[in-house]
Every structure is written in C-alpha cells, then in structure tokens.
C-alpha cells in the first residue's frame, strides 16, 4: 500500500476512534496511545530510507556472490577527502561520494580529483539542511537542482543518483524525486563514524556484519574515518572483498 491510501485509511480509523470515544465505547487514552504510535511509525518510515516505503532505494544487492561491496562517503568534498582518495588508490578500490553542493563550490579541485580517479559522485543536496524533513516539495527540488547545477559547472556531469541527508524520505521528498528523476542510493551497513568516537568499535562493527553486495555508509568529513578506512581496506583485501562504485554494484546509470 502506498502512503496516500494508507493515510486515508488511518484518517478514517481515527474518526471512527473519535466516535467510539464520544459514545464511551473505548477510553480516550487508548486513542491517544494509537495516535502516538502512528506518529512514531511516521518518524521511523521517514528516517529509514532502507525500508523503501516512499521510494525505491538501492540499499544492497543480494544477488552478488563475487565479494563486491560498495564503500560510500557522504558530506564532502573536504580536505579530508584527499586522504581518503589516496587510500583508495593505494588499495585499488573504487568508491562513491555523495557530495553537498556548497562543498563542491568551496572545494572544486577536490571534486574534480574524485572524478579524475574514477570514483562516482552523487547528489546529497546543496546545503544538507537539518530542516530536510520540513522542506516543501519545491524546496527539495531546488536543493537537488542546485547541487546538480554546481556539479555540472565544476565537473561537467549531470548527477542521476541521490542520497537524502540523514536518510530522510517523506512524501515531499518522494514528489521531488519524481520531478527530478534521481535514483535513490541508501545503505544497509551504517558505520556510525559520525556519531561514535571509538575507531575500533566502528571497524569491528563493519567487519562483523559485512557480506557481499553490501553498501557501507561512511563520511569523508570525519577525521577518524581515514584511520578506519585503511584498516577496512586491508580487511577487504585479505578476505577477497572488492569495493566497487554503486552504479556497478546495481547496474545503474550514474550520469545523464
């Protein structure tokens, strides 16, 4: 069931609940609990792109058996990206960078270097605003288009893949993506490198859970990610894994 008919059913059930409360057939507290549960459900489906509730997202590829995985980096390009690029080159690995438009504008040479070294770049909106979940449809479209515009000006490419900031997908983002035609790239293995401070814990968490076809979420604006990455690349090399671009993992067109 898509969101719109689902929401209509919920609204009808809510009014039925109000009537039941009015005629004292159920407690008002039961209705309050149900409403709160629904709001919590909305929060979950809006912040978990992997659930594919509003849009189809490419989170992992279960059909992969040859050890291919995808390393993905969000929130660059930044100075730290250069160290990440050096490590990827050292271990002959390819990755995907979901770039913020304003960071491309501030660091055009780094953005160009990502492309020159054969990695994928995708759209991560222009500003990566914390208000992403509250933007109107047209505002989301503008965020996506502005990022695409600066990427084209700097790199001469038209981005077709998109990763939502904070993994937020709601009906407004859904409508924006229908308008822009971007393909959504999610993840199924989150490193939490932007939240946790223990490099060993983060690395062990990835290594413990990794399997062929996985999409791993990292951040190139986090200093500890460089140290984590080298150890991770060593593990991949020693255990017959190979990092590829997400367009190759899913057989997608990255640019148009």
Question: Which residue stretches match the model-derived regions?
Answer:
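Acidic-and-aromatic substrate-binding clefts and catalytic sites of carbohydrate-active enzymes
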Residues: 75-79, 98-107, 131-138, 163-169, ...
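A cross-domain feature marking catalytic cores of carbohydrate-active enzymes
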Residues: 73-75, 99-101, 123-125, 164-166, ...
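His/Asp/Glu-enriched short active-site or ligand-binding loop at hydrolase and phosphoryl-transfer sites
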Residues: 174-209, 241-253
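CE4/NodB-like, metal-dependent polysaccharide N-deacetylase domain
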Residues: 85-99, 119-120, 137-168, 175, ...
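Active-site beta->alpha N-cap acidic-glycine motif
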Residues: 42-132, 142-146, 150, 158, ...
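Residues at alpha-helix caps and immediate loop-helix transition turns in enzyme cores, especially N-
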Residues: 84, 107-110, 173, 198, ...
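Short, acidic/polar
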Residues: 34, 78-82, 198-202
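Terminal accessory/targeting
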Residues: 1-71, 86-96, 208-256
């Amino acid at each position: 069931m898509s969101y719109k008919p689902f929401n209509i059913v919920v609204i009808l059930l809510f009014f039925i609940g109000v009537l039941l409360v009015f005629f004292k057939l159920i407690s008002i507290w039961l209705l309050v609990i149900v409403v709160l549960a629904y709001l919590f459900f909305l929060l979950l489906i809006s912040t978990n792109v992997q659930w594919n509730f509003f849009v189809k997202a490419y989170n992992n590829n279960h059909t992969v058996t040859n050890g291919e995985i995808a390393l993905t980096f969000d929130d660059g390009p930044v100075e730290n990206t250069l160290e990440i690029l050096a490590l990827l080159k050292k271990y002959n690995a390819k990755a995907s960078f979901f770039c913020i438009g304003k960071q491309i504008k501030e660091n055009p040479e780094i953005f160009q270097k990502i492309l020159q070294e054969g990695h994928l770049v995708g759209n991560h909106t222009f500003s990566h605003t914390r208000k992403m979940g509250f933007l109107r449809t047209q505002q989301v479209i503008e965020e996506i288009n502005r990022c695409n515009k600066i990427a084209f000006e700097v790199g001469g490419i038209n981005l077709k893949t998109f990763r939502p900031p904070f993994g937020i997908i709601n009906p407004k983002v859904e409508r924006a993506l229908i308008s822009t035609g971007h393909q959504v790239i999610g993840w199924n293995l989150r490193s939490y490198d932007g939240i946790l401070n223990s490099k060993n814990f983060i690395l062990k968490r990835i290594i413990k859970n990794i399997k062929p076809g996985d999409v791993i979420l990292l951040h190139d604006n986090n200093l500890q990610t460089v140290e984590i990455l080298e150890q991770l690349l060593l593990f991949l090399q020693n255990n017959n894994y190979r990092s590829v671009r997400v367009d190759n993992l899913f057989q997608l067109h990255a640019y148009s």
